[in-house]
């Protein structure tokens, strides 16, 4: 990604201190289990290690480390029974979920030959799970439980831990980067309008405002021909251009992409919401004509660029890009009642990483429908198979909500006028999907990603403390 972020995950383990002097062999046993457990965390996150906690004081020290690091998530390994005072001081002042990992070392007891230290050390991780949840509830903390086994391996446990770490990346990205708003939202699309101060207070995402006048001149100082030529080739490698593409044909576009990439790094931008409604003449017209592919080049590098000034869908695109590797702006395009499928897509910038069925294409159109000017239009070709849609909306009090649906993209004819579109079948049927999705009150834009990601989105929502409306799976 152009702007890298790395989630910070607080990790610690707990055990009842009274056991250790009674059964000293538990000390190396627990140290080994905890060391092995930490290896399960992917290297995509920064581990903040709170150690093995057996006293309230150790728990408070772990909490100090977690607060100082501003952790995005806490993962707690239950080694054996422990009282909740080993846990609660570490998380009391945090506003992130606590994932309780109840992973038993042995798959099953050897009933006749199990002594007390063997039971306590290898078979008793489940002893305090309910107690921990009870006290997390009373403390108003969000929580989750993962149960599994070490012996023989447990891919489900590994997958859940990695999924939580992916979800934690979203919080870190929202906190450590900025959103660029260029211009203003499309006039009259009031569902897109947003209070940027409320956005920061609720989601920790800061909005930087930019005028188009600055953007028109952004490429004026880009003169390194080797850099421009390399970026032009990158554009040609990304898109098939109608009528053929050459380095010379996309030279000016490449200059803008290079400039935008540097701007994104300088301003630490991971989200862009833009809309231009001027006269599209002179330098303004030049940039407007090639903005769609230029922003598409940013999207494939992890910068969510949303048209029509839609900040909320930029967030949705970034979430899906972060957890799945692709995030494509979409909206309801049509319903094929004969086939009982929804046609979903959008014009404008898109994510080359979703275009797995065919190389993205680019062509010149005389007019951008509903907008100022004309120029390059890009089309992307999502593959047949599972697809996830994510919309973000707000209630009357400014609280955010996620709206999610999973479906299946099917083969068949699509529109050919240059916009990305896909044929999605939903388990509830096209008619009912449209009713349910609309009744959930989303903005008219949504983000799309290949695969099924509802479970990960639910984790993201728990981390961000946002409700979720699952429309269909």
Explain the meaning of each model-derived region.
Residues 231-323:
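Long, internal scaffold/assembly segments composed of regular secondary structure
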Residues 71-80, 99-101, 269-275:
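Periplasmic-binding protein-like
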Residues 296-416:
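C-terminal catalytic subdomain
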Residues 59-71, 88-90, 257-266:
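Short, well-structured alpha-helical segments in soluble
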Residues 2, 6-9, 107-232, 236-239:
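Cap/lid and interdomain-hinge subdomains that line or gate substrate/regulatory clefts
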Residues 31-55, 142-148, 205-211:
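Short beta-strand elements in bilobed, periplasmic/extracellular small-molecule ligand-binding domains
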Residues 370-473:
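Extended hydrophobic packing segments that form well-structured cores
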């Amino acid at each position: 990604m152009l702007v890298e972020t790395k989630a910070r995950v607080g990790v610690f383990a707990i055990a009842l201190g009274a056991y250790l002097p009674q059964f000293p062999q538990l000390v190396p046993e627990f140290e080994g289990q905890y060391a092995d457990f930490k290896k399960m965390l992917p290297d995509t996150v920064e581990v903040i290690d709170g150690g093995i906690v057996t006293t309230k004081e150790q728990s408070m020290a772990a909490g100090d480390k977690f607060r100082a690091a501003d952790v995005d998530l806490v993962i707690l390994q239950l080694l054996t029974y422990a009282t909740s005072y080993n846990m609660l001081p570490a998380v009391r002042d945090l506003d992130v979920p606590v994932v309780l990992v109840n992973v038993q070392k042995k798959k099953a007891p050897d009933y006749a030959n199990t002594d007390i230290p063997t039971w306590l050390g290898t078979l008793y991780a489940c002893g305090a799970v309910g107690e921990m949840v009870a006290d997390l509830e009373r403390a108003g903390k969000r929580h989750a439980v993962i149960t599994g086994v070490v012996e023989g391996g447990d891919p489900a446990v590994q997958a859940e831990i990695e999924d939580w770490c992916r979800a934690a990346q979203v919080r870190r990205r929202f906190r450590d980067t900025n959103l660029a708003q260029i211009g203003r939202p499309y006039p009259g699309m009031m569902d897109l309008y947003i209070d940027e101060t409320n956005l920061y207070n609720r989601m920790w995402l800061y909005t930087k405002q930019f005028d188009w006048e600055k953007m028109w001149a952004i490429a004026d100082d880009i003169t390194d021909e080797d850099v421009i030529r390399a970026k032009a080739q990158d554009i040609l490698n990304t898109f098939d251009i109608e009528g053929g593409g050459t380095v010379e044909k996309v030279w000016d576009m490449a200059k803008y992409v290079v400039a935008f990439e540097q701007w994104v790094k300088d301003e630490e931008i991971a989200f862009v919401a833009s809309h231009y409604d001027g006269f599209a003449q002179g330098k303004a017209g030049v940039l407007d004509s090639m903005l769609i592919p230029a922003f598409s080049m940013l999207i494939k590098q992890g910068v969510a660029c949303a048209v029509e000034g839609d900040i909320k869908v930029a967030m949705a695109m970034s979430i899906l890009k972060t957890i799945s590797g692709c995030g494509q702006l979409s909206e309801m395009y049509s319903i094929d009642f004969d086939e009982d499928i929804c046609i979903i897509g959008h014009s404008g910038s898109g994510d080359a990483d979703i275009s797995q069925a065919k190389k993205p294409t680019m062509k010149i159109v005389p007019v951008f429908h509903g907008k100022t000017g004309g120029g390059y239009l890009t089309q992307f070709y999502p593959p047949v198979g599972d697809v996830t849609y994510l919309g973000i909306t707000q209630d009357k009090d400014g609280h955010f909500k996620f709206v999610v649906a999973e479906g299946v993209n099917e083969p068949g004819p699509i529109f050919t006028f240059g916009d990305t579109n896909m044929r999605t079948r939903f388990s509830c049927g096209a008619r009912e999907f449209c009713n349910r999705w609309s009744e959930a009150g989303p903005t008219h834009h949504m983000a799309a990603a290949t695969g099924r990601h509802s479970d990960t989105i639910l984790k993201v929502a728990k981390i961000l403390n946002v409700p979720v409306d699952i429309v269909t799976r």
